[in-house]
A protein has these predicted regions:
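Bacterial N-terminal signal peptides
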Residues: 15-26
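N-terminal leader/linker segments that initiate helical-solenoid repeat arrays
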Residues: 29-82
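Alpha-helical repeat scaffolds
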Residues: 61-66, 97-103, 131-143, 167-179, ...
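Flexible helix-coil transition and linker loops at the boundaries of alpha-helical arrays
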Residues: 65-73, 105-112, 144, 183
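Alpha-helical adaptor scaffolds
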Residues: 85-150
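Terminal, low-structured helical/coil segments at or just beyond the last alpha-helical repeat
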Residues: 178-220
Length: 220
């Protein structure tokens, strides 16, 4: 327990500097990063596009368990990412950014682990309201994989609609429908297709679906 407390203290001491560095990176380029070119189809499964969970979220000693996992090494990366998510959810974004900076610096975006870090970071940023920064992380995760990951169209559509870039959102949603029309042609299966999304996020995507259905864009 004492070791875990010391580890948390060390992470917290580093939070200020890392947060400042990441904020500067976001201000001077990440937010303006363009999205990859829209493709016709997105059939490729990306095993990295899943929440990184080591300890069940309802555990009473969640933070202590995650700190122990970080120290043991075998699941240190997953534990670091989950701990970052806990920090964001508890209103401690500076600590969350520090932990994600640590996880990002230890992985390459061309690896499954690196893509997973950036995919998860994107979701935590999105839920913090930093949608442009979330898109930058997701774009990096997408670029690290050969092929066209199936998670991309709906995720980008959600983010772009949230930013008010509704025409672009519909274009990305159309790619999801072209790829799997039985899945994305309506919003009826969202709970099954998007189990890790919040109800509010699925509701936003349903707005995109309605806009797509009202005027489906042609390809190309």
């Amino acid at each position: 327990m004492a070791v875990a407390r010391q580890g948390r203290a060390g992470v917290m001491r580093a939070a200020g500097l890392a947060a400042a560095l990441i904020a500067a990176m976001t201000t001077f380029g990440l937010a303006a990063q363009p999205l990859p070119a829209l493709q016709e189809f997105y059939f490729d499964t990306d095993p990295a596009a899943v929440p990184m969970v080591v300890v069940p979220a309802g555990s009473g000693d969640l933070v202590d368990q995650l700190m122990k996992q970080r120290e043991r090494g075998r699941k240190a990366l997953d534990a670091t990412v989950q701990l970052a998510g806990v920090a964001f959810s508890q209103g401690r974004p500076e600590l969350g950014r520090t932990l994600y900076a640590e996880a990002s610096s230890s992985t390459q975006p061309t690896t499954a682990a690196g893509r997973a870090v950036r995919w998860n970071y994107g979701w935590d940023l999105f839920r913090l309201g930093e949608v442009e920064a979330a898109l930058a992380q997701w774009s990096t995760a997408q670029g690290g994989m050969r092929g066209n990951p199936s998670w991309v169209p709906a995720t980008y559509a959600l983010a772009l609609w949230t930013l008010g870039r509704k025409d672009e959102a519909v274009q990305w949603y159309a790619a999801a429908v072209r790829t799997e029309p039985q899945q994305w042609g309506s919003s009826a299966r969202y709970a099954d297709l998007l189990p890790s999304w919040r109800d509010s996020e699925r509701a936003t995507l349903a707005e995109v679906q309605k806009a797509w259905a009202a005027q489906p864009p042609a390809w190309p």
